[in-house]
Amino acid sequence: MMKNPLAVSIPGLTLKNPIIPASGCFGFGEEYANYYDLDQLGSIMIKATTPQARYGNPTPRVAETPSGMLNAIGLQNPGLEVVMQEKLPKLEKYPNLPIIANVAGACEEDYVAVCAKIGQAPNVKAIELNISCPNVKHGGIAFGTDPEVAFQLTQAVKKVASVPIYVKLSPNVTDIVPIAQAIEAGGADGFSMINTLLGMRIDLKTRKPILANQTGGLSGPAIKPVAIRLIRQVASVSQLPIIGMGGVQTVDDVLEMFMAGASAVGVGTANFTDPYICPKLIDGLPKRMEELGIESLEQLIKEVREGQQNAR
């Protein structure tokens, strides 16, 4: 039997291909199930889940930018109980689709409460920890900007989680390396990166920010070079697997993420412009890999990681 050249294995996840719709751009999957069979996907990262329901930020919440968009949704979600009882069971009809649950919170206790329970769902195979949230107990500074806080949070959720933890790194920091190292020391199983870059747009007529929240997260093709740089930086100091994301919209973008050091790839904003983008990427990968002399993604991951080790 021929080996699947697109297959990759990372902690908790045996993926038939590396393409994963990113959290916040794919709802809870059901919205896209009208377009294609979700079982085609490597995995899906569902919308952020918090202990209680959140209504999110006031509108306007999104603004277009050249080569991207700003969003300030504010983690709108139905809360842990509804996700466990309604959203996740609906995805059980896809037997070959491992789910990555995205977890957010306002304090360490929030994260611990959700991580302790959500991994018990039979189809949740890993957790993505969104540490870009403001820590309300520490003056609103994001968890992911302080190595010590990031270490403590990772350690706390690892104690209660029954599935591997992938910590989502924020690019809104001076130096990402000490934060990644602190998270690895806290026991993380991998990273997902990058989260959105902080941005703002101003309405020339009102002279005020377009977003009601004033600032929002910048995503889309504009941030891809930043993502590539940061993935490369983290991969050069850590052997933990990385789910790379940030501006992916073509097959070449996917392979560039792998060559920077990723072991799987998240696709976010591109889902809004083309609902079929993920199946298209999956279909297009084998031909492009053949053109570039790439036998398999597992082999590419090995070669890139070995090359980075030798460069140290």
From Swiss-Prot:
Binds 1 FMN per subunit. GO terms for biological process: 'de novo' pyrimidine nucleobase biosynthetic process; 'de novo' UMP biosynthetic process. Its EC number is 1.3.1.14. It is found in: Cytoplasm. The keyword Cytoplasm applies. FMN binds at residues 23, 47-48, 102, 130, 168, 194, 220, 246-247, 268-269. Substrate binds at residues 47, 71-75, 130, 195-196. Its cofactor is FMN. Optimum pH is 6-8. The active site is at residue 133. Keywords: Cytoplasm, Flavoprotein, FMN, NAD, Oxidoreductase, Pyrimidine biosynthesis. Pathway: Pyrimidine metabolism; UMP biosynthesis via de novo pathway; orotate from (S)-dihydroorotate (NAD(+) route): step 1/1. One of its GO terms (cellular component) is cytoplasm. InterPro entries: Aldolase_TIM, DHO_dehydrogenase, DHOD_1B, Dihydroorotate_DH_1, Dihydroorotate_DH_1_2, Dihydroorotate_DH_cat, Dihydroorotate_DH_CS, Dihydroorotate_DH_I. Its main location: cytoplasm. Gene3D superfamilies: Aldolase class I. It catalyses: (S)-dihydroorotate + NAD(+) = orotate + NADH + H(+). Pfam families: DHO_dh. One of its GO terms (molecular function) is dihydroorotate dehydrogenase (NAD+) activity. Disulfide bonds: none annotated. Catalyzes the conversion of dihydroorotate to orotate with NAD(+) as electron acceptor. Heterotetramer of 2 PyrK and 2 PyrD type B subunits. HAMAP family: DHO_dh_type1. Belongs to the dihydroorotate dehydrogenase family. Type 1 subfamily. This is Dihydroorotate dehydrogenase B (NAD(+)), catalytic subunit. It comes from Enterococcus faecalis (strain ATCC 700802 / V583). The gene is pyrDB.
